[in-house]
């Protein structure tokens, strides 16, 4: 990495003149033809640039000059000594409106300064070159930190946004960081984006990175910004609909100026490698009746090695894609006549039902009672619960006898009716109601993605109605439940406690008491957990659980959420032990698998189609050595079928024995039972596994018994343990 010198209070790098490529380009008058891109059938850089770029830049430069003058005056008049506290408790002397986080980082070590992506001042992310304003705490975040990654990818999105304006000339919309990388949406009057354009876009991005364009932050009045962005109706919508303050911020890099809260990296040169890898179309703010936008996705890293690792990871993820494996293994499919609703074929249905049986077996041990509730409810139910006001767009609704009804998108309101259908006593609490009811959510067709984003699904949904003082024990039970299930799957997980948000409903004392009980439960649970302050729902604190799959991806499936508001909305009460008949229960919303469909997608990709024996839709393949053993092979298969195994036979006369065994291994049959004349005479089978481990000859009865044991214990390595 290049060594950089400390910045001056203005944010410029001492001894290094920031490159303003846009000014140089404008001086050229657009007479030189761009050499970037276009040679592979894709688009090339526009020449000249769209007029709005020059107009916007002229306006910005005037505002920036005024801002710099005001800042210099403020630094001269109002600057005073301040104390900056570092994470180790050490305090550093600084000057308000002059000293920047970057200067402090340089004072510690140049290596630290070079590797810092962004600062965190008083727990808020902050530009490295933005002067500090008062006494504060300071953290210096490297790329490994999640918040730093978000900033790094956000800055990369601006680089790509600049390239998109210079290539397409359209109107930029939103360009956020996402879980792995970033995207930018653009509205084009004509035409669209092609993957053939990626090369010219990447070439231009590399040029922008090489220029080390400084990221500049500027606070501007809303009405001025409406004038600056009058060419772009989408930015004007954001200003009019989302900005409720007199001023907001824009950021500039080169000729790009965009509405943005920031912060950003110091300059574009901090992005060491950038790849554009995907494009799609979408609607403005996801609404099907709004304009169609072009979306381009990218990824970037501070080290080319990380990009190579990412590309390798993408290839592995592609090979594990549940949609491909589902097709290849004949587990499930989708059809245009019912978008977002999966058709589970017999072998896929086996996985689905086995997962539900697993959860049901745990319900019996843990005191849950399974219920069945309606699929369709009058809209009055959803008005009472509050979902109609906030969620009706995502519900399938229709008229019945002049009244509005809807398919249920969740089970909790129906469970509230169950609790309320007769008087309840403290003796009945905790009441644990479980429901595998079918749910429907009206997802946009463009958002539907295999089994991970569907319209029709089922959850291992449960609601615990309990007294306030029972919360701690119930949460302990929920945590133990999820550990039991996830250990069977081989998932590790991480836990976050999300506490009271700024805009919460209810009594603060109830919140404090509940949060304390959640903390106690987590501490006793014994697994590492982190506090996520202020990130709870408005109606109660929650525990967020993320599982980690075989290739290192995290997925949120389980839910443990306290709810103080739904019992109030439905006026749920019980008679307490001291005779108070207005006592209010607390609801614990709880799921372990979450959506069964989504969990099947995760498990498919986690195992790469190599299902563990207990869950496998192809547990046993019986292979006869020749046609004279076909009848015996069918008899053996029937014995395994009767013992409730997923068993098949390969009677194909056109295949050799070795070919049949290889086919069974490729189809991921856990156990392959070869039968010849010897086995036929002695009532035995010769056992090998899909990984070609040979277990030798056993009687059919002995084999059935052993496989039943392995199935009942849900062994992760049944083939080895046999």
UniProtKB/Swiss-Prot annotation:
The modification Phosphotyrosine is found at residue 297. CDD domains: TGS_ThrRS, ThrRS_anticodon, ThrRS_core. It is an enzyme of class 6 (ligase). The keyword Iron-sulfur does not apply. Its EC number is 6.1.1.3. ISGylated. GO terms for cellular component: cytoplasm. The modification N6-acetyllysine is found at residue 242. Keywords: Acetylation, Aminoacyl-tRNA synthetase, ATP-binding, Cytoplasm, Ligase, Nucleotide-binding, Phosphoprotein, Protein biosynthesis, Ubl conjugation. The keyword Methyltransferase does not apply. Residues 78-142 form the TGS domain. It is found in: Cytoplasm. Pfam families: HGTP_anticodon (PF03129), TGS (PF02824), tRNA-synt_2b (PF00587), tRNA_SAD (PF07973). It catalyses: tRNA(Thr) + L-threonine + ATP = L-threonyl-tRNA(Thr) + AMP + diphosphate + H(+). Homodimer. HAMAP family: Thr_tRNA_synth. This is Threonine--tRNA ligase 1, cytoplasmic. It comes from Mus musculus. The gene is Tars1.
